[in-house]
Amino acid sequence: GPGCPVCVTDVPEVDEAIVLATQGVRIATYGDMVKVPGTVRSLADAQAEGGRVHVVYSIAQAVELARETDDEVVFFASGFETTAVATAAVALDAPPANLSILSAHKYVPAAMEVVAQHPESRIDGFIAAGHAAVVTGWALFEPFAARTGKPVVVAGFEPLDILAAVLKLVELIAAGEASVFNA
């Protein structure tokens, strides 16, 4: 769901945004990120204490904020491949000089690799998010499947999509196939 990227944002990244917000920098970030706890407090706490935190729905709004002020604006970017594209597009398209990006973006295959390689992992296969695969292409998961010996099925979030993915994943596991399938 929409809160997933904030769930995997590292505490030091949140702490860095909090420090900036309390030093006069305007932090622009997604609403869910404001409530994520850092080591001692959240961005919401920092805002209540005078920190400069702005909730935005896209990086485009952070760009607008930067154009409306001479203050330093930092977009605290979180998310996976789907939100990284918009962040990268702004970074490559002559953003305002007073706009910086604090990237907390995550890369799905790297996260899967950590889970697959964990010594206590008992996972036999993975269902990968279809919306991320739309950005990267589902073939991105082929090296992972080959390296780990675990199948990957790409699916959407609708109940039937997930059920179809589970069925295909069970079939691949039963057949001993470490391949990638787009459900």
Predicted feature locations:
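Metallocofactor- and cofactor-centric catalytic cores in central/energy metabolism, strongly enriched
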Residues: 1-70, 84, 91, 96, ...
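Gly/Ser/Thr-rich helix-start
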Residues: 2-4, 80, 131, 157
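Short, surface-exposed amphipathic charged segments that create phosphate/polyanion-binding patches used
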Residues: 13-16, 67-73, 114-120, 142-143, ...
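Short, surface-exposed, charge-dense and proline/glycine-enriched linear segments
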Residues: 30-31, 62, 88, 132-136, ...
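Short hydrophobic alpha-helical runs that function as membrane-insertion/retention elements
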Residues: 54-55, 74, 100, 152-155
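Secondary-structure boundary elements
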Residues: 68-71, 92-98, 118-121, 150, ...
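Phosphate/pyrophosphate-binding betaalpha-module
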Residues: 76, 80-140
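A conserved active-site cap/scaffold subdomain adjacent to cofactor or substrate pockets
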Residues: 102, 122-182
